[in-house]
């Protein structure tokens, strides 16, 4: 039976993550001059600090000899595959590189608190196509990166969770009124992220669409704004974050797939998976 050292109430921790991220979304939506969706507002900083201070910490008995958890704790830092350029999800403050804010970023910090009793995270930014390799070669311990659980990926790595559900959606330039969703992408040039579910999902919905893939989300957004594609298909959460940060973009229609987010970890590491799933239950 899993347990945690602290007896404080935990159920509101994940809710606090959502609330802090929503605060950032509100600030981002009302101030287009801001490059960073979180971390600069004093109230938000205070909320993040309170959230981390109230987070659960794992019992010593869970760190069994030879386990991944023990190795991480002995090392003294959690190595996380995590973006630095995803608004509202995981974005680095350009004026303070140590400040990374957003939903995935806060969850990674909470997991490190569960392991160490305080946030100790070292971020390794992945591209979409390198996430599995980073886990397979031990460069990172976990991946928090809007990481959709798929059968193909689950053959290469393991997933804890899911901890959130989203879906693929369509983004276009703000002045584009011709495309209103996936049904309008037949015969269009569609931008997708390399090694993302959109690579397979778009042809299934629109076989005549021409795909152009990019390694990172910022590259894909830039390509759309430069007119190198008619639309960008990506996870709705990421697209909505981009649109909130950039008034030249908009999301059209509704998500047309269901995409559960998981936490990536090494293939077959059942003990570590159970450890993380227990932590997810504690913060819900």
Language-model regions: role of each:
Residues 22-27:
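C-terminal motif of bacterial Sec signal peptides marking the signal peptidase cleavage site
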Residues 29, 40-63, 105, 176, ...:
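Extended ligand-binding regions for polar small-molecule ligands
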Residues 38-47, 51-143:
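Extracytoplasmic small-molecule ligand-binding "clamshell" domains
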Residues 78-82, 98-101, 182-195:
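Short loop->beta-strand "edge-of-pocket" segments that line small-molecule binding or catalytic clefts
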Residues 120-184:
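Acidic, polar ligand-binding/catalytic clefts
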Residues 121-133, 177-178, 212-222, 226, ...:
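Short helix-initiation/N-cap motifs at beta->coil->alpha
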Residues 130, 147-155, 201-203, 225-258:
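A ligand-binding cleft/hinge motif common to bilobed small-molecule-binding domains
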Residues 164-172, 236, 240-281:
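Periplasmic-binding protein-like
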